[in-house]
Amino acid sequence: MSAQSARRCSWSPHLAFDAAITPNLRRWVTGDDGSLTARLVAASERFRVARLLQRPQRPLADEWQVLGQHDRTPALTREVLLICDDIPAIFAHTVVRQRHARRDWPFLRGLGERPLGGRLFVDPAVAREPFQFARLLPHHPLRQALQRVLPAMAPLPMLPARRSVFRRGDGVMLVTEVFLPDLLSRPSPGTEAIPYPRYLRTTDRSPSTHTTETKKETTR
């Protein structure tokens, strides 16, 4: 396998069959086009976001053209873990052209450890394109990034992932979500859209040092 092909995977509008993808996990991956965070909150007692990095770096080989770039010029990259009941459930990877980040996605700079969905799913100016799906093998760069944080993921032969493009003004944002083994057994709250929790919504005035952790017993 060439170094170039190792950086790519086959993205498709449909999630291919794989015996490792149980019916419950498939419901998580292919569920509604609303907020995954809202579904995770509904399926857990405690939810939080752990930011792993946010900095300019070269987009992946299968990302830069989606962003509308002519080459692999560094893009603003954000990676987080979405954690349910102290167990990582999702590895999320977001890329935005740097000039678009300043102009169309200014909230990214101070988002900290708050969920991205707190802005995307409450802003009527944001439009989302249909999902693409893939099965990520251990050699894929996103698997490599995940395995540096969670080495226990390395032996797994495949992890399902999905990605979608968000647009706001002229800005393009590509969000990829990798589904971790916790969701094999965590019951999916269904396939219909769940309203985004009001207490998770963020504004430009929210402090950048805020860390999101929700508990069922403290919410309304």
Swiss-Prot record:
InterPro entries from the UniProt entry: Chorismate--pyruvate_lyase, Chorismate_lyase_/UTRA_dom_sf
Compartment(s) where it occurs, according to its Swiss-Prot or TrEMBL record: Cytoplasm
Keyword Cytoplasm belongs to the record: yes
Catalysed reactions, semicolon-separated: chorismate = 4-hydroxybenzoate + pyruvate
Domain of life (superkingdom): Bacteria
Region Disordered: start-end pairs: 194-220
Keywords, alphabetical: Cytoplasm, Lyase, Pyruvate, Ubiquinone biosynthesis
EC number(s) reported in the record: 4.1.3.40
Pathway: Cofactor biosynthesis; ubiquinone biosynthesis
Family: Belongs to the UbiC family.
Function: Removes the pyruvyl group from chorismate, with concomitant aromatization of the ring, to provide 4-hydroxybenzoate (4HB) for the ubiquinone pathway.
Protein name as it appears in the record: Probable chorismate pyruvate-lyase
Lineage: Bacteria, Pseudomonadati, Pseudomonadota, Betaproteobacteria, Burkholderiales
